[in-house]
C-alpha cells in the first residue's frame, strides 16, 4: 500500500512478518480461523528471508500454524517452513470455532546471536490472500528487543502481553498434534524453539500489570473489555462510540440486540454518556440482522446510526471496493472547537459482535475461541488537518466516516446465512516419518510419539 499523505504507508498484514534489519526469523507461532498457502508462503519468506525454494531445501519448520479444523491442510511443499498442525480431537475441542488471530514471532540478530526480538501481532483478519486483496481489516503489533529488558521503564505492559500470548499458544499446543515439531533437529527445529522459549521467559519475568491482550477461555470478550476499562482507572464517560463488525447475528433471529447491549452496559459503567453519539459500521452487502434493524436502532436511546464502513484513503488510495471484516469498538470524547480525541480507548480483535464471538466464553457449542486487545491510543485526532500526521487521524486508522449513513429506506442486504463448517483436518495416527541411514541404505520409521 502506498500513500502520499506525509509519506505514510500503512503496513499490510503480510508486511508484519518482515524481519527487522539485521535480523532473521528464528521461530514463530500463528493461530487463526483460516489461512492459505499463498499468504503463509509470503509470510514465511518475509520472516526467514529465504525463498520458497531455499526453505524447501533447508527442510526446517519455522512457523507452527494452529487453525480451525475446518481449514483444509496447508501442505509443507506448498508453504515450506510452515507446519499446519492438526487438532487432536475435533469432536471434543473446547471451542465452537478457533477464531482468535494471533502471531508470536521471534527473530535473532544475524551477527550478534545474543540479540533477539519478539513480535506480537493481533489481527482482525485471517491469514489469507483474501484479507490482503478484498477485506477491510486492522491489526495491532508490538516489538520487544532484548536490549529493552535491561532496565527500560514501561516495558512491563508489553512483557505482560507476551506472557498472555505465550499462555494461549501453550494451551493450544496441548490440543493440537505437535509431534512434527519434535522431529529431528533439521526438520522440527527443537533447538530454535528452546532458545525462543528462554527469550519468552526473560520477557515474562519483566511482565507487570494487566496485559492488553486477552482471550475468552475464561469469560466472554465483552466482559474482558469492560473489566479492562474499569481496572485501568480510566472510568470516564465518553460522548462518542463507534462499533464495527464483519458479521452480526443472523437475520432469522430477529432484530439485532447486541449493539444495544453494548451501549447499555457501557452507560451503566459510566463509560459512555446517555446522550452520546453512537455509530455502527457495517458491510451494506452483508450485514445479517442489521439489515432489518436500522429503524429500531435509530429509535434507541441513544440513537445508534448505521453507517457503511469507509475505506481509509491513506491505506487504500486505489479505492478498490472492500468488504468490512474488522471487529472494533472505539470511544472518545469530542469537544467543540477541538480536533483531539479525548480519553480514547479501542477494542480490536477477532470477536465479531455476535453471541458466539462477543458474549460467550469459549465452549464446544456456544463460544468461539477469540482474542483481542484493549488499548488507549495517545495523540489521536478526529479529522485530517494541516500539520496533523496521517497516522494520528482516526479515520485513517479505522474504517469509519461520518458523511454517509444507511437511512431506513436505504436497501441493505443481510447476505447469506453462515454455519460452522464440518471438520476436515484432524491428527492422523502417524504425523511424519524419519529417515534412518544404514551402511547398506536406510529405512523410514514412524516419528517419535507416533503410533501405527
Where are the predicted features?
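PLD/PLD-like phosphodiesterase catalytic module centered on the HKD motif
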Residues: 1-452
